[in-house]
């Protein structure tokens, strides 16, 4: 990895603004080995915003992007093309706002697809002493909602919904709520990919839509299968192969927080169109459910549903209660 530091001062003409330090980090993508690797950088005291610009330098390769602070997770943008920005009170989608702690941070890079070899990456990390993002007063710490009330009855809902906090989706929670209410739903589970940044917007959305329940969750997205963590409000590491990170450990961690671990679209094998969508991992003991309808019968149809039902039926035949 090569590191270039560009400091801005009154005596130096450089591509950095006042109050910024630019770190240019580039290098080769490790060939083989684990699916994720890390590019560390140091953040000094007084930094209030960090921007990470990223490039996979290829029309054919696909790299995914995330960010860790000294304590761990700060966001996972996956295939988001825009830069990642984190600040004290605001962040770009998929990332978590909060204190910018001095110390060793790292860019997390996932090797989603590598065909143009040798592969390389390029990063520009911008450290600022003043924020550039507009305030996001709608962000707040997540607290469980009391529920809809109304007593025992059947409740209609959607257990696999992505908001704009996922790279493959655009709608804010208000638009999701409007569609859900138009279809007579009582709840929606917001299962964004490998992040829980959406939970910071739940309080405002729930207050605006008291008759629609927003259920926390996350889509545990790996390169060999996706699973839904229904009810999850604590992040669980998805980087399979890193120390202590296994499917069994992840499923157990979700179960420990009261979330249901459900395999999503288990037979959806579309290659590069949907990387890792078919389930190829082992089946964890804590598996609670299997998604058998993805996208609705009117769109995905029996092309997805029959194979998913067969997958579920086989597991039930092995003695599992799902």
Range-by-range predicted roles:
Residues 20-32, 56-92:
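Surface-exposed beta-strand/loop patches in noncatalytic accessory domains
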Residues 48-51, 96-118:
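Noncatalytic modules at the cell exterior or secretory-pathway interfaces
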Residues 4-14:
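Bacterial N-terminal signal peptides
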Residues 43-45, 54-58, 111:
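Non-cytosolic beta-sheet module surface loops
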Residues 69-73, 129, 233:
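Solvent-exposed strand-loop boundary residues in beta-sheet-rich modules
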Residues 140-286, 291-320:
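A metal-dependent hydrolase metal-coordination microenvironment
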Residues 63, 115-127:
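Edge beta-strands of jelly-roll/beta-sandwich modules across compartments, strongly enriched
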Residues 17-47, 134-156, 164-166, 178:
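Non-catalytic extracellular/lumenal accessory regions of secreted precursors
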